[in-house]
């Protein structure tokens, strides 16, 4: 096999399709939201979702100490939210970076403008080098807007 540069690996792996979502996290009075793209469902029974989180991030620190986190997905028309959460978030009562949130019974933030959200209980943490893969079991989820509304915004 030939030597592959880090640049070639980065350019190539960026072509793997990935959804964008916001991970909501909380521990001991500190809240955060973080844009994430390494997201996948890993099991139907139990219902598990996995997310890759940078080991140097605030979100990693919070998720590593807490048993719960959220995954929030947004309309393709509402992309500004992802820019707002590329750096640590500022929390004020009912808001993260001025985005309205509601806290679950486990005190993790769900984003009021999300088209679907999942509350997850961490079942496994797998350190894979620069990132840790958190696997969580779905303990609650909701699609606040109608499926018809979502379909109307899809492009073929």
Where are the regions a protein language model picked out?
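Conserved small/polar residues in nucleotide/adenosyl-binding loops
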Residues: 148-155
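N-terminal structural module
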Residues: 1-73, 140
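Beta-strand-rich interaction surfaces with strong enrichment in secreted/lumenal proteins
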Residues: 106-109
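Short, conserved beta-turn/loop elements at beta-strand boundaries and strand-helix junctions
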Residues: 126-130, 143-145
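Hydrophobic core residues within well-ordered beta-strands of beta-rich domains
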Residues: 116-118, 132
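Glycine-rich, pocket-lining loop/helix-strand segments that form or immediately flank
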Residues: 56-103
């Amino acid at each position: 096999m030939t030597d592959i540069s880090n640049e070639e690996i980065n350019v190539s792996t960026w072509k793997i399709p990935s959804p964008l979502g916001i991970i909501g996290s909380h521990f001991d009075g500190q809240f955060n939201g973080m844009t994430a793209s390494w997201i996948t469902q890993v099991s139907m029974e139990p219902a598990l979702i996995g997310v890759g989180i940078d080991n140097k991030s605030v979100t990693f620190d919070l998720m590593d100490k807490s048993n719960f986190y959220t995954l929030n997905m947004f309309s393709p028309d509402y992309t500004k939210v992802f820019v707002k959460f590329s750096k640590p978030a500022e929390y004020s009562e009912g808001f993260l970076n001025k985005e309205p949130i509601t806290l679950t019974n486990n005190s993790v933030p769900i984003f009021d403008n999300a088209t679907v959200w999942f509350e997850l209980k961490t079942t496994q943490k797998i350190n894979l080098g620069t990132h840790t893969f958190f696997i969580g079991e779905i303990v609650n989820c909701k699609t606040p807007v109608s499926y018809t509304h979502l379909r109307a915004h899809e492009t073929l």
